[in-house]
């Protein structure tokens, strides 16, 4: 039997009240209730709402997918940093079961988008820093630098805290 009580399964939880509502308002060209953060994170939330409707699954699914997407980035980052597959695997496994990562990627807050782009920014910056400028054509050395800058911009367009990571 379904209990119609307000729970995390049937309603908003924590900051979802702001972000899910604002995503809904963005879809319907209404005045945005929450405007303290840049819009990109709420645009991502609105994609889930457009596909699955204005319900907890709809406003949470895209953030969950971004949380899953963090795992390969962390694996690649760990492998590039430590040059050992097993260390990258351990790091990724620990992160996959970290309570904060698990919790934050299951609710519709914009933190997950900023974090994803920060991780991607650091990964591409590490690739740039480890590039051999003697063996690589100059234009090719700029690709990871450009991607790092792009990820920084997307992070800042998701949540202002990405500015601190870029400093």
Predicted regions and their residues:
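Extracytoplasmic catalytic/substrate-binding loops of multi-pass membrane glycan-assembly enzymes
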Residues: 1-20, 32-44, 54-57
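Juxtamembrane segments of multi-pass membrane glycosylation machinery
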Residues: 28-32, 44-65, 84, 99-100
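Alpha-helical transmembrane segments of multi-pass integral membrane proteins
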Residues: 59-66, 91, 110, 155
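Membrane-interface transmembrane helices that cradle and orient dolichyl/undecaprenyl
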Residues: 79-82, 121-145
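Short helix- or helix-capping micro-motifs
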Residues: 91-96, 103, 123, 152, ...
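Short acidic/glycine- and proline-prone juxtamembrane loop motifs at membrane-interface regions
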Residues: 100-113
């Amino acid at each position: 039997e379904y209990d119609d009580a307000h729970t995390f399964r049937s309603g908003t939880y924590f900051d979802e009240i702001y972000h899910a509502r604002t995503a809904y308002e963005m879809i319907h060209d209404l005045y945005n209730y929450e405007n303290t953060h840049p819009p990109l994170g709420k645009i991502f939330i609105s994609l889930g709402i457009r596909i699955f409707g204005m319900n907890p699954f709809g406003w949470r699914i895209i953030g969950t997918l971004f949380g899953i997407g963090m795992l390969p980035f962390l694996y690649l980052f760990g492998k590039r940093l430590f040059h050992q597959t097993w260390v990258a695997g351990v790091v990724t496994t620990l992160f996959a079961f970290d309570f904060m990562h698990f919790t934050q990627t299951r609710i519709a807050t914009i933190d997950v988008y900023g974090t994803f782009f920060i991780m991607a920014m650091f990964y591409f910056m590490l690739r740039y820093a480890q590039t051999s400028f003697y063996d690589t054509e100059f234009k090719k050395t700029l690709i990871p630098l450009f991607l790092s800058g792009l990820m920084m911009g997307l992070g800042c367009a998701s949540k202002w805290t990405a500015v601190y990571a870029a400093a």
